[in-house]
Design a protein with these regions (language model features):
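Cell-envelope/extracellular polymer assembly enzymes that use nucleotide-activated donors
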Residues: 7-9, 38
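Short, acidic, metal-binding catalytic loop of nucleotide-sugar glycosyltransferases
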Residues: 26-36
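A conserved acidic beta->alpha catalytic loop
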Residues: 27, 39-54, 66, 90-94
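Glycine-rich, basic loop-to-helix element that forms the pyrophosphate-binding segment
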Residues: 65-81
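Catalytic-site signature of metal-activated, phosphate-bearing donor transferases
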Residues: 75, 95-223
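Short aromatic/hydrophobic "clamp" motif used to bind/position activated sugar donors
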Residues: 86
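Flexible helix-coil transition and linker loops at the boundaries of alpha-helical arrays
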Residues: 197-201, 233-247, 276-283, 317-341, ...
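Alpha-helical repeat scaffolds
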Residues: 223-233, 264-276, 302-315, 360-373, ...
Length: 484
């Protein structure tokens, strides 16, 4: 470290997130206590209480009038940085544990590298049960030329030297939306900016990949399909060497968008074309195997679905054992999460469906335990929930089906989510009510009633199931008569 110069400059981009900003700042304190650091905050907030909070942690607070350009805001902090290294973070992120970052610098290992990556854990629900992990490059050795580029999805360039993966986790809540309007607002902010940048630099693959991600996240399936088809035929893209690892994003976006539009046969055809392409990376192939399995599950082709999932898991070790190569393949968005928690839940859920359909009781129970039965199962792939409910009706006599019914009932939020995602199959269950009652499937009757009755009322009836059965019949008949 040069005399009087900080080893690390930390730059925080602050907004009006008063509920998360202190947690972010507190997570930086161990780094600031153990390393020669400076903390620079670029303050885009409009709330006086945010400014007051920031001053508790640093006197380097720079006001910035928001202009819809993330790079301009970031460069405002970068221009003030005096450190040898630079780390940037947002106010909806916080380090779970910064020990590995501290060790990287205190050990002197940083001398051998030009940049470092750590894991960003993106949460998708308020309970922090559903998330994806992605390597992000947020720490660099400063040089005279480096600047943030891009109005959105900004990045530092140029960066020199080799990179180091540091096993530190920064949690991120920016993808948790209180309302659909909030999620839509983000989409409507990002997409015009990306299209504007693509118009300025039409050969820049980075923006095309990010636009695929935006369409995917917003579930704009028709736009996603159209854009991916065009991108895969773009001659300028095809001629770029980087296309060999990034094309997987376009293949994945195309297949998933077709699946989501209920065209399983066509999606399976697109998978076969994609995996035979020289531009589809091994990680892309693994992701497409998972989508192929889902397509077969929707067609009730259980043996084929199971075979795809077995191949998906067989490829995992081969793909992930070389961390450096794996990180390169993960530059392709969407497929970067091929082996994250959500996609593995999808894979286990497909296997559960296959084994439930084939009455493999022991396998169903084993897979049921792997899934950690809660609302994250529904989030993993809501399209599979109706199939699960259908199979639970068809195979209601089995012990494994009873176990799953019980778990759904015991977890009210999971039950509510399944009802919301799968209404037509709850109605199908209602149609089969007399079968439930005749066979005396007590747990299924309880689930059926939960469609219409408050749990606190139902709990009082658990010891008098015959009475519940009569109430179920009368209640559902009454509701159905009201619909006529």
């Amino acid at each position: 470290m040069e005399h009087g110069r900080p080893l690390l400059s930390i730059s925080l981009l602050a907004s009006n997130r008063i509920g998360t900003i202190r947690r972010c700042l507190d997570s930086l304190l161990p780094i600031m206590e153990h390393l020669p650091c400076e903390l620079i905050v670029v303050d885009t907030s409009t709330q006086p209480e945010v400014r007051e909070l920031l001053w508790e942690y640093t006197d380097r607070v720079i006001p910035f009038w928001w202009c819809n350009d993330f790079s301009k805001a970031r460069n405002c902090g970068l221009s003030e940085a005096r450190g040898e290294w630079f780390l940037y973070i947002d106010d909806d992120e916080w380090f779970e544990n910064a020990d590995e970052i501290i060790r990287f610098f205190n050990s002197g290992e940083y001398h051998d590298y030009g940049y470092a990556n750590y894991v960003q854990r993106n949460f998708f629900d308020p309970e922090y049960q559903t998330y994806t992990d992605n390597w992000v490059s947020r720490m660099v050795r400063l040089n005279d030329e480096v600047r943030f580029r891009s109005k959105i999805h900004e990045y530092l360039d140029p960066v020199y030297g080799k990179g180091k993966n540091i096993k530190a986790i920064a949690n991120h809540t920016g993808y948790i939306y209180a309302t659909e309007e909030e999620r839509r607002k983000r989409y409507e902010r990002n997409v015009p900016l990306l299209k504007e940048m693509m118009a300025e630099k039409p050969d820049q693959l980075r923006w095309a990949i990010q636009l695929v991600q935006e369409y995917y996240s917003a579930e704009e399936w028709k736009e996603l399909e159209r854009f991916c088809r065009v991108a895969l035929q773009n001659e300028n893209y095809k001629q770029q060497p980087v296309m060999k690892r990034l094309a997987a994003t376009f293949y994945a976006g195309l297949v998933e968008s077709v699946l989501e539009q209920n065209r399983a046969d066509e999606a399976l055809d697109e998978v076969r074309k994609a995996v035979s392409s020289e531009n589809c990376s091994p990680l892309g192939v693994a992701y497409l195997l998972l989508q192929e399995a889902i397509g077969y599950a929707e067609k009730r082709a259980w043996n084929e679905a199971k075979e795809c999932i077995e191949k998906y898991f067989a490829l995992e070790k081969e793909i992930t054992e070389d961390e450096e190569q794996y990180a390169i393949w993960q530059e392709a968005l969407i497929v970067d999460s091929t082996y994250d928690m959500i996609n593995k839940k999808k894979a286990y859920l497909v296997l559960l469906l296959c084994n439930l359909a084939q009455d493999n009781e022991a396998e169903v129970i084993c897979l049921f335990l792997k899934l950690e039965w809660n609302q994250s199962v529904v989030y993993a792939y809501p399209r599979l929930m109706p199939i699960l409910l259908e199979l639970l009706v068809e195979h209601a006599k089995g012990t494994s089906a009873e176990t799953i019914w019980r778990s759904i009932w015991d977890h009210k939020q999971l039950c509510d989510m399944m009802i919301e995602e799968s209404r037509k199959y709850w109605e199908r269950i209602a149609i089969t009510k007399r079968t439930f009652l005749r066979e005396n499937y007590h747990e299924q009757v309880m689930i059926l009633l939960s469609r219409y009755y408050k749990p606190e009322i139902l709990n009082g009836y658990t010891l008098c199931l015959p009475d519940i059965a009569q109430r179920a019949l009368g209640l559902i008949d009454e509701i159905e008569r009201g619909k006529e």
